[in-house]
Structure formats: structure tokens, C-alpha cells
């Protein structure tokens, strides 16, 4: 019996143009060619989706877990002009306002009642209420990435934007962030008190780097600030009140494009991710149960003049994101048309959540809650990672974790493929492997010494695997 020859090829990759966590990492949004969707971050669940016609979106930015979203048009056929910000009320399913500028919008940051818009050389801030009111405007250096970050905790005031000189950061203090509205029964805990007024006026400019900035990040409180530059090797942590350098952390030795930095909500750790396909975790607080790696020559630096490199702190944990080929490809993929949109298969966004630990020592005391990471890739991968040392972040609780999120619209769950251990990156047997895999292997050999891997607790898919996009 003769059978016709069949070829096995990978499925068409999901085209996700942008992924955004809300400030508290309770939900995230995903923009695709078909529209956008809102998901619960953990447990992963599709909450609602909007299939749009007439163009594509570059970004959908959520305002906490409210129904208000900020839309930016983009792609090869933008739904909205790139110089507009659309305020979309998803409860109404329609646009409620728009902001128009004379140039393309580069970035957005928001908190309750406020929206900051980054343009090429300035940042404009608006107050949101019954009407949208222009609050102020600040000049910056050339800012093609649209960098800005805003503190979102109750009573926080900090907005950070690029300075007028390359590598500098401006610290702007807005009116205090209001507390979230209470929709259910009153909480049992006392309301958060505003912090005491600083003894002296806080700094307004930090000379963070000598090269162009690539990321700006702040924790919810706004007490700290993280900066990275185009060199992509160092992460600097600053005190936002005094402007002093608190820590200097080293991602690696090879030049890389750092995509983002995220503070743990209690500011005891940070995570960093880049185009190397690796998520690095650093400890910030002493006595946190985890310590960053250091050179064996580090203890000698107070006594012997050694190069600064030998005093560097390296991540204590990391996780290498498997390439798309490790999931869905076992042969050469079909050729792509020249006009097809291309998504970086290893570009990702990372956020912190709190989840029950898999290591329960005393079942009678209730679930042990720990900080974990959620990694979202632009090809629709959802990873839940636990840290190698979780004792510092674990707390006992008898109350189940819940998020203030509306009920789901879609009843079809995503495909689940849970795993209990990290899976090594596959760099052979597929033409989907990244063009810089060799450099990543070198980084893994150098930076992987004495480091520990995060544990992959759960892997799932979002996007087209939910039946949309």
C-alpha cells in the first residue's frame, strides 16, 4: 500500500502585538490582528474579548481592574491614528473620549485618576474625572521608546520620565494617588495612612547613566527607581527621595536589550528580562533568604583596588524561556509572506503575583502564600514560575486569594499543559530557533554558574488557543 508523502509543519504562530499587565498584575491585556482581550493573570482565564474590524491596535493599557482601557492604533493598518489616545469603556463597549496630539504617541502610564502620555520629546499628564483635564507638561530628551513609569499605591506621588540630557531621569511629584473605591463590604484592615512629609524637598534629577535609557521602573510605593541603559549589562536601583544609588546589579557581560524590570510589591526582589531570552531574579533586601551571586574576589575589593566588575552582584535565580520551536515545531515552518507581521518569538513581559506554595509543611495552618512570577510571551505563552528560595516571600493564610475582577465572558478554557520542572531551551532540530541562540548559549554558560533555576509550575497558552485572534 502506497501513501502519498505528507509533511509535518508547525502551526501558524500567534501574532500578539502587545501585552500589558495592570499595575497590580491582577489582569493583563493582549492585542492581536483580530482585536484585544482581557485575561485574569492567575489563575489564567479569558475574561472578555473584543473582535475589532477596520484596523489593528499597537497597545491596550488597562487602568487597574476597571473597565477603562487606553487604546493606541498601530501596525500596518492602524485602527486609530498613531497620534491619538482612545479612552475605551469596556463595560459600554465603546469609545468615551480621545486625546489628540501633533505627533505619534510613544508610551502611556496610568494610575487611578491620572494618565501620562509620552511623546518624542515631552510628557503630558492628564487628570481623569467627569472630564479629561490637562494637568502639566515636561520636556525630555529624545525618547523614541516612550519611557515613563508611575507609582500606583495609595498616597504615592511619583512619576519618572527621561531628563533633558541623555541618561538622566526626572522625578515629578503629582498629587497623592487616591485609594481604590470600596465596592463590597468594608475591609477588616485599617485604611493606609499617608506617609509623613519628607524633611527636605526630594531630588528632581538623577544622572543615572552615560548612555541612553532603555527602561524606567518603580514599585507601587515609588520609594525606589530602577534604570537600565543601552549597554544592557547593569541595573541600577536608586532612592527616589535622596537620589542616591542603592544597588548596582549585573545582568550579564554581553550587550543586550533589556525589555523590562519589575519590582516585587514588597520591594525585596526584582526581576529583569531581555532579548537574551532569560528572566533574572535579584534580591534587594538583606536577610531575605536569598543572596545574589558575587565574584570570588568580591571580599577583597575593600582592601585591593580591583576593577568594578569584581564587585558586581549577579542574579541568584534565572529562567530561560523556551523558544517557540520547543513547543510547536518539529520541522521547517512554512514560508512567510513578505508583508506578514513578525513578532519576536522570545519577547516577553513579566509580573509578580502571590499564589499558594506547592510546598505545604503544615496543612492545618492553611495555604502558604508566596511570591511567584508570570511570564507572558508575544507568541501566546503563559508561564508561572516559583523561585528557588521562597521562605522569605511565603506567608501563612487561611483565606483564599482572590482578585477584584469581573466575571468571565468566555466559558471556553485555554489549553492546559502543566509542568513541574523547568524545561531546557531547544536550539537544534528547528529553523524557528532564534538567530542569536549561540550568544545566548554563551551567556548561559557564563551566567549559569552557581545560579539556580526558577521552577516552572504551570504552562498554558493564550490568544488563538482561546478560540479567538
Regions found by a protein language model. Give the residues of each.
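Beta-propeller domains
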Residues: 24-53, 74-89
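Hydrophobic beta-strand positions that form the internal "hydrophobic ladder"
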Residues: 28, 69, 115, 159, ...
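Canonical WD40 repeat/beta-propeller blade segments in eukaryotic WD-repeat proteins
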Residues: 13-20, 55-61, 103-109, 141-152, ...
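Per-blade loop-tip surfaces of WD-repeat and WD-like beta-propellers in eukaryotic adaptors/scaffolds
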Residues: 40-47, 86-94, 125-138, 164-204, ...
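Beta-strand-rich domains and repeat architectures in extracellular enzymes and scaffolds
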Residues: 5-35, 54-67
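Conserved loop/turn motif of beta-propeller repeat scaffolds
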Residues: 24-25, 65-66, 112-114, 154-156, ...
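Terminal intrinsically disordered, low-complexity extensions flanking WD-repeat/beta-propeller proteins
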Residues: 35, 56-57, 62, 139-144, ...
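Asp-box/WD-like beta-propeller blade repeats and closely related beta-sheet repeat scaffolds
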Residues: 92-153
Amino acid at each position: 500500500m502506497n501513501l502519498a508523502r505528507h509533511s509535518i509543519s508547525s502551526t501558524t504562530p500567534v501574532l500578539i502585538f502587545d501585552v500589558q499587565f495592570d499595575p497590580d498584575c491582577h489582569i493583563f491585556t493582549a492585542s492581536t490582528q483580530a482585536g484585544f482581550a482581557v485575561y485574569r493573570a492567575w489563575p489564567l482565564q479569558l475574561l472578555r474579548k473584543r473582535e475589532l474590524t477596520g484596523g489593528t491596535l499597537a497597545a491596550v493599557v488597562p487602568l487597574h481592574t476597571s473597565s477603562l482601557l487606553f487604546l493606541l492604533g498601530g501596525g500596518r493598518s492602524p485602527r486609530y491614528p498613531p497620534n491619538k489616545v482612545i479612552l475605551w469603556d469596556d463595560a459600554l463597549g465603546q469609545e468615551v473620549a480621545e486625546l489628540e496630539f501633533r505627533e505619534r504617541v510613544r508610551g502611556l502610564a496610568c494610575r487611578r485618576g491620572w494618565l501620562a502620555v509620552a511623546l518624542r520629546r515631552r510628557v503630558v499628564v492628564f487628570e481623569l474625572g467627569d472630564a479629561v483635564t490637562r494637568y502639566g507638561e515636561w520636556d525630555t530628551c529624545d525618547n523614541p521608546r516612550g519611557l515613563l513609569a508611575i507609582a500606583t499605591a495609595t498616597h504615592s506621588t511619583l512619576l519618572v520620565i527621561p531628563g533633558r540630557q541623555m541618561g538622566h531621569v526626572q522625578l515629578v511629584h503629582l498629587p497623592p494617588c487616591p485609594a481604590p473605591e470600596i465596592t463590597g463590604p468594608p475591609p477588616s484592615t485599617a485604611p493606609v495612612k499617608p506617609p509623613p512629609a519628607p524633611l527636605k524637598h526630594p531630588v528632581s534629577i538623577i544622572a543615572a547613566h552615560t548612555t541612553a535609557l532603555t527602561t524606567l521602573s518603580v514599585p507601587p510605593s515609588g520609594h525606589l527607581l530602577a534604570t537600565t541603559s543601552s549597554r544592557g549589562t547593569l541595573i541600577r536601583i536608586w532612592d527616589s527621595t535622596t537620589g542616591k544609588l542603592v544597588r548596582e546589579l549585573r545582568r550579564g557581560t554581553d550587550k543586550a536589550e533589556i525589555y523590562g524590570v519589575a519590582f516585587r510589591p514588597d520591594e525585596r526582589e526584582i526581576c529583569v528580562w531581555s532579548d537574551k531570552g532569560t528572566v533574572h531574579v535579584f534580591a534587594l533586601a538583606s536577610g531575605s533568604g536569598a543572596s545574589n551571586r558575587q565574584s570570588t574576589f568580591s571580599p577583597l575589593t575593600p582592601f585591593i583596588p580591583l576593577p568594578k566588575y569584581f564587585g558586581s552582584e549577579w542574579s541568584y535565580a534565572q529562567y530561560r524561556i523556551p523558544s517557540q520551536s520547543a513547543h510547536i515545531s518539529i520541522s521547517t515552518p512554512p514560508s512567510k509572506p513578505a508583508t506578514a507581521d513578525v513578532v519576536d518569538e522570545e519577547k516577553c513581559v513579566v509580573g509578580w503575583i502571590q499564589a499558594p506554595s506547592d510546598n505545604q509543611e503544615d496543612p492545618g495552618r492553611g495555604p502558604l502564600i508566596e511570591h511567584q512570577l508570570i511570564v507572558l510571551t508575544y507568541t501566546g505563552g503563559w508561564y508561572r514560575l516559583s523561585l528557588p528560595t521562597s521562605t522569605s516571600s511565603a506567608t501563612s493564610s487561611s483565606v483564599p486569594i482572590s482578585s477584584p475582577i469581573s466575571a468571565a465572558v468566555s466559558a471556553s478554557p485555554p489549553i492546559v499543559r502543566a509542568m513541574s520542572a523547568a524545561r531546557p531551551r531547544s536550539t537544534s532540530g528547528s529553523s524557528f530557533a532564534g538567530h542569536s541562540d549561540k550568544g545566548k548559549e554563551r551567556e548561559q554558560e557564563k551566567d549559569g554558574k552557581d545560579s539556580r533555576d526558577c521552577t516552572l509550575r504551570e504552562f498554558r497558552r493564550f490568544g488563538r488557543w482561546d478560540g479567538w485572534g
